[in-house]
């Protein structure tokens, strides 16, 4: 695991050398949702305000984190994402019972409202502060549950319509040794991921 300082240093060094054009920042939960989100916001804030970083920042938000932290993240990140995880609520309940689909959708809805609110001009200015100017996206794992392509595409269509997403990403399920017995042992063909796009 990298420290926040290491992530900042690596990002700046790779950016200066033209190895990268930006940063995709994601993390598993460390201590708590808020602690993890605070660290990710700190990285984005320091890159922008202290180091004048002009590259792209995509920050993967944690739905259980406090709303003010997700709002602060949007001031420094070009795009925010909240992962839907799986195409159906039943799949989430079966394979990720610690996740709450309603919380995920509520966070996505709140983020959409904030993006729209910050895009509206005010009486004092023609534009407000930038807030996640590249919008929000999500990702779902395909092939872990029994959802067929029609179900996955239906879920994607609802997500685009309901939350104003800029992109739904698909990631083919990859089995992990010694994981839950509920998960399939065989990886779905990569062609399925490509077909969904």
Predicted features, each with a name:
Residues 197:
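Helix-hairpin-helix
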Residues 1-138, 144-146, 159, 182:
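Conserved Radical SAM active-site core
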Residues 189-191:
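Terminal amphipathic helices with adjacent charged low-complexity linkers/tails
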Residues 138, 149-184:
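A conserved active-site cap/scaffold subdomain adjacent to cofactor or substrate pockets
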């Amino acid at each position: 695991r990298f420290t926040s300082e290491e992530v900042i240093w690596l990002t700046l060094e790779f950016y200066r050398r033209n190895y990268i054009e930006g940063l995709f920042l994601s993390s598993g939960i460390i201590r708590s949702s808020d602690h993890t989100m605070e660290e990710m916001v700190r990285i984005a804030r320091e890159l922008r305000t202290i180091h004048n970083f002009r590259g792209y920042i995509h920050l993967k938000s944690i739905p259980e984190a406090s709303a003010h932290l997700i709002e602060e993240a949007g001031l420094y990140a070009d795009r925010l994402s909240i992962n839907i995880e799986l195409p159906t609520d039943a799949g989430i309940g079966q394979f990720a019972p610690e996740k709450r689909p309603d919380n995920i959708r509520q966070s996505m809805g709140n983020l959409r409202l904030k993006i729209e609110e910050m895009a509206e001009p005010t009486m004092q200015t023609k534009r407000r502060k930038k807030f996640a100017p590249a919008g929000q996206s999500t990702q779902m794992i395909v092939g872990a549950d029994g959802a067929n392509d029609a179900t996955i595409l239906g879920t994607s269509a609802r997500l685009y319509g309901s939350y104003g997403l800029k992109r739904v990403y698909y990631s083919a399920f990859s089995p992990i040794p010694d994981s839950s017995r509920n998960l399939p042992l065989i990886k779905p063909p990569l062609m399925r991921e490509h077909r969904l796009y």
